[in-house]
């Protein structure tokens, strides 16, 4: 299973959810066994610091029992919500990942093999904003159903509170967990990881100076 050694961390964070949220997650581990091709869909919370996909793929490759050949593609739009993304076009586009150019300027071509898993996040306030919450649930369900019909496991990435608005942690945790339970989808509790890290390791700054986006350490924590 992807990042087995990190599954223990997920379990501990889900236990923390009983402290920060009144909702218990129904799905606590991924259904996919060692997904080789992962699509990440989101916004600047994902693409800051050269992208969360880079530390994630390094973590996967550092876990020898997972083998080789993992690919992660990141599709982001700054400031976007789930409603901005045409997920169907992403998973059906045969040109995504179809080539690479190495350091010697050699073009390598690849066959499109599709995706095993798609990790999605909404805008930082959308799940808790009174004028966006319904759309969060609508598109969480729409995208999840589409992915499942195409044999791709959907995963929601719970985002974190703004540094100066810690009350967002509980609010976001509840809405993401409810959406996950409604759609039978795993939620990776990144927001809870931020909360726990700041309590346990206050000397590590997880935030960019704007108090919203991740620092390098925050991006690495999101990947883990």
Residue ranges of predicted features:
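N-terminal secretory targeting modules
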Residues: 2-66, 70
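Generic structural motif recognizing short loop/turn segments at the entrances and edges of beta-strands
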Residues: 12, 34, 68-73, 78, ...
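Conserved SGNH/GDSL esterase-like catalytic core that processes O-acyl groups on lipids
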Residues: 37, 47-133
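Alpha-helical cap/lid subdomain in secreted, periplasmic
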Residues: 103-219
């Amino acid at each position: 299973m992807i990042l087995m050694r990190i599954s223990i961390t997920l379990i501990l964070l889900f236990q923390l959810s009983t402290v920060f949220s009144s909702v218990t997650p129904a799905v606590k581990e991924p259904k996919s066994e060692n997904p080789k091709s992962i699509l990440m869909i989101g916004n600047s919370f994902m693409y800051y610091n050269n992208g969360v996909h880079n530390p994630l793929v390094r973590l996967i490759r550092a876990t020898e029992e997972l083998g080789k050949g993992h690919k992660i593609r990141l599709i982001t739009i700054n400031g976007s919500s789930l409603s901005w993304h045409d997920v169907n076009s992403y998973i059906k586009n045969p040109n995504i990942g179809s080539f690479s150019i190495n350091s010697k300027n050699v073009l390598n071509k690849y066959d499109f093999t599709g995706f095993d898993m798609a990790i999605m996040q909404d805008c930082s306030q959308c799940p808790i904003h009174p004028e966006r919450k319904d759309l969060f649930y609508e598109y969480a369900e729409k995208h999840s159903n589409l992915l499942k019909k195409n044999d791709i496991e959907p995963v929601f990435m719970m985002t974190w509170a703004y540094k100066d608005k810690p009350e967002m942690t509980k609010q976001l945790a509840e809405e993401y967990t409810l959406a996950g339970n409604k759609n039978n989808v795993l939620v990776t509790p990144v927001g809870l990881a931020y909360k726990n890290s700041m309590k346990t390791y206050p000397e590590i700054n997880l935030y960019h100076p704007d108090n919203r986006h991740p620092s390098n350490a925050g991006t690495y924590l999101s990947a883990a």
